[in-house]
Amino acid sequence: MLGTLLASCSSLQTISFDQLQAADVSFPDAVRKVAVINNMPVLKTKDNHEILSSELEGDGKVASEALAENIANVNYFDQVIICDSVFRAQDKVPRVNVILTNEEVRKLSEDLGVDMILSFDRIHIQTKPGVLFYPDFPMPIDAVDGIISPIVRVYIPNRDKPLFVVAKQDTISWEIEPALSDRKIVKEASEYAASIPVEHLLPHWDEVARFYYDGGNIEMRDAGVYLRENNWDEAYSQWKIAYEKRKGQQKMKAAFNIALYYEIKDNVEQAKEWLGKAKKLVKSGSRDEQLIAFYSLE
């Protein structure tokens, strides 16, 4: 589970690791087969390389296929079906209301043999001038920023309204170069837009960064050695000894590290309890107090 990256900063060290994040929605246990449908109209996109449009609509076929692939890769459902044929084939412009009716949801579910429908309803792309910065290049690069706003609705048969709606924004950038066109922006933005709903719909892993205290006494130094060997249980044992033996700020730092240990072990209640112990020991107005306050908000 842990991929660690350690960097020194006085007695503070940083560590990064993968942490499982919960989804924003819970599905009924009976939902094992799902379908992703393309609920967007087909709009022609210019391949003009000289003038870029400020407002664009995404490619439903590209987006729905990418969303189905992204969901299938998580291995959360037994089966993911893609229905990328155009559901709104006759639409010439995006509809204001694209919510599926109960009858449409029922028929789609029966025809496709699924328990749930994920309807990719729209991708709005707003472009504006931007800049890119590269570490080894001294000057900013002219770019186009694309503000991407996908909308995905989740349906279960026999419900009066969607179970869940994902309507989030994100931004990606393209370096301005001769091959850049509306068509390229729409294709790549549509592929990227399909990644946005997944973290809201399904449990996923995110890399998170945390601080811990290293050194200052023999127990904390030994714990740091164990931690760099990825031996969290032995590190915890040394922190616990330090907490019981030491006083003042050394005791506070041991409590803070024990809170991290319990977070790693997915024991949220114990992590909060030990963070609270550290908070009671910290000096008012110190950097340590700011650090604990930051974690208390998370």
Question: What is the predicted role of each segment?
Answer:
Residues 64, 102, 148, 190-198:
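Short, hydrophobic/amphipathic alpha-helical packing segments
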Residues 119-176:
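Amphipathic beta-strand/beta-sheet edge segments enriched in Tyr/Trp
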Residues 30, 36-119, 159-164, 286-287, ...:
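N-terminal segment of the mature soluble domain
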Residues 5-8:
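C-terminal motif of bacterial Sec signal peptides marking the signal peptidase cleavage site
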Residues 1-2:
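Sec-dependent signal peptide recognition
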Residues 53, 57, 141, 183:
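Flexible, glycine- and charge-enriched loops at secondary-structure boundaries
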Residues 10-31, 153-298:
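C-terminal/domain-edge helix-coil "capping" segments
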